């Protein structure tokens, strides 16, 4: 199912993998456990960092080849993704239980440093409340994503789903607590250059933008790369078309396998992110309301669709 070369790399990167499902401890959970530092989602949306699971039901399957992706892409190691067969997709109840079990196994590793973590925080981490379905791969390729989200909600979780927006029919169906669409290009040429996608994929993404106003809580995330897509005003028309609740402008980070495709200089500094956010603020319906220097990210809110950012 997963080529051995990719599996070995993912395991070396500390992915827990079971079938087509994977969990990896977010670096911010580690910082919260050991240094009591919160992630930007805590600052922006009020989540408890140490109680968040980072997972995917489709660990290596994605339609795009984004140059900024820190994950290993099949083409990075000479594998044609079209030659990798889709797995036999497991039922959502099975995937849910696997995600919880893998996450618990990771957190239990902190039992050995309980003096640094603290018993209260450790116990809370063993009872997660949030799940980010965003680790690797494209989650909408998992055919039971809607059912999986509902299972998480039934069990008291808030859900964050991050999608490339290609499968409009799936996006229309799902209702996570917060839906993220990654919009990293402003036209077909930039899409091909940055995301390595097909023309029909770009057209599908545009169709998805048109249905986002019907969703309960939405965010567009744009990963900015110096010299590739940092002319923020070229995005304004698409942002207005989507009419989402929030926009996150985030710098590309020179980590993981992206280091083989881009240079360190392609990252933007936080003051540059803020400058672009203020430019967007002055030229659109979206107003700058928060930022996080550690993550080089700025949050803007749609002044025509105001909701409380905090969950």
From Swiss-Prot:
Its cofactor is [4Fe-4S] cluster. Transmembrane segments: none annotated. [4Fe-4S] cluster 1 binds at residues 26, 39, 52. It comes from the Archaea. Component of the wyosine derivatives biosynthesis pathway that catalyzes the condensation of N-methylguanine with 2 carbon atoms from pyruvate to form the tricyclic 4-demethylwyosine (imG-14) on guanosine-37 of tRNA(Phe). Belongs to the TYW1 family. Monomer. This is S-adenosyl-L-methionine-dependent tRNA 4-demethylwyosine synthase. It comes from Methanocaldococcus jannaschii (strain ATCC 43067 / DSM 2661 / JAL-1 / JCM 10045 / NBRC 100440).
